[in-house]
Amino acid sequence: MTGQVDAVIGAFRNFELNQMDIEGRKGRCFYLEEEGIPAYDELIYVANPATMDKDKVRRFIKATELATQFIINNPDESWSIFSGTAKELQNELNKRAWRDTLPRFAMRPAAFDHGRYMDFQAFLVNSGLISKTLPITSIAIDITAN
């Protein structure tokens, strides 16, 4: 807001443009997926497969899915519940960010797309960011698989 920055990378697309608009500043988002970056999962739960309780993790992921469905299906009620947890959330910025976050939720958070992970690894190799791809089983597991 100080006018000292022309661009940022890694900003939260649901907050920064809303904050700028509230402050009367114009902004534009460059969507990474429109600039050649393959689609990737932004929120990944991490657990040690050697020590995790698979049943607990499965139930947690299922609860996440049910909560996501409730939020999407009941945006006003879910906003009231969320914003009711802390007074500092009850402002225009957070209300706008909530609205802009809803379409970004994965309706099936447990879904595991092997191809997406392999495509992103290939992108990282081709960009010189990693030296080689790894077997998908060494970097992620499908917690819903038996």
Task: Give the positions of each predicted feature.
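Secondary-structure end/capping motifs
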Residues: 53-129
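Poly-acidic low-complexity segments
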Residues: 19, 31, 74, 90, ...
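Pocket-lining segment of extracytoplasmic ligand-binding domains
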Residues: 2-85
